[in-house]
Design a protein with these regions (language model features):
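Polybasic, low-complexity intrinsically disordered tails and interdomain linkers
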Residues: 1-158, 236-242, 248-256
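Charge-rich, low-complexity amphipathic helices
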Residues: 164, 168-171, 247-251, 255
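Long, charge-patterned amphipathic alpha-helical coiled-coil/hairpin "stalk" segments used as oligomerization
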Residues: 121-233
Length: 256
């Protein structure tokens, strides 16, 4: 743990403080002046003295979902056309978000496994009957309902033949499911996996936890994601312009 934190230019205590305050904000608690707020005009009394206005107490809003905590990274001195792109999966210790939807494109054996473990699947043999590879629209709408798509190892080479290149173009390239894989463990890994990815834009973001998680666990996810990104950048920390942490419905806090 100390080795992980010591090789980062980001102060882990600052990250933890930001996460803790986001959690407090989600509960409706006052976070003081921790977050950057819009400037307010100062009022004066008749004697010309500045009067401090009391800020009204916050009331936590109730949402039908659990807020996710994300990190946002802005890059600098990085040319998407010249500098290397990367796409590295990273399995985090803590599941970074809820409701990760996973689909298995299954051969006959994996259809049985998925049924036994109550895992959503689509028989691979029926894909050609369901979709036309020359009509990408329906394939896109179907695939985008899922965060992760797995495919039985026996059929992984036939994906493009049956569905064309559409899944790759929308970043839903199926990942192989080995016959020897423990299905439940595989899905657990997928739910804890984020992709440290750079393609064209200089702004990157990843989920690293939920406001209901322990601040220490979210902090560790943050540090792992940041350090993995830095390892992939051409000039490391010299390519990092800014790093913010924020929650789904909350404000942002700069941590670098």
């Amino acid at each position: 743990k100390n080795d992980l934190f010591s090789m980062s230019h980001v102060n882990p205590q600052r990250v933890k403080d930001a996460v803790t305050n986001l959690q407090a904000y989600a509960k409706g608690q006052d976070c003081g002046d921790f977050f950057v707020r819009k400037a307010k005009k100062a009022e004066t009394d008749h004697a010309g003295q500045i009067v401090k206005k009391e800020r009204p107490a916050r009331v936590a809003k109730q949402y039908k979902f659990t807020e996710t905590i994300e990190i946002q990274v802005g890059l600098k001195n990085y040319d998407p056309k010249k500098d290397p792109r990367f796409n590295q999966p990273l399995v985090l210790p803590l599941m970074p978000k809820t409701n990760t939807r996973i689909l298995v494109l299954a051969d006959a054996a994996d259809c049985n496994r998925c049924q036994q473990d109550n895992v959503e699947f689509h028989p691979f043999d029926t894909l050609a009957q369901t979709f036309d590879k020359n009509k990408p629209g329906p394939i896109k709408r179907w695939a985008k309902k899922y965060d992760v798509i797995l495919c039985s190892k026996s059929q992984i080479k036939n994906i493009v033949k049956v569905l064309g290149p559409t899944l790759t173009k929308i970043n839903r390239q199926p990942l192989p499911l080995e016959p020897t894989d423990n299905l439940k463990a595989k899905l657990d890994d997928m739910r804890r996996t984020i992709r440290i990815q750079f393609k064209k834009v200089l702004g990157l973001n990843w989920p690293v936890g939920m406001v209901s998680d322990k601040a220490e666990d979210v902090t560790r996810n943050c540090m792992l994601a940041i350090n993995t990104l830095v390892d992939n950048l051409k000039k490391g920390w010299q390519n990092i312009k800014v790093i913010n942490v924020h929650s789904t419905m909350g404000p942002s806090k700069r941590i670098f």
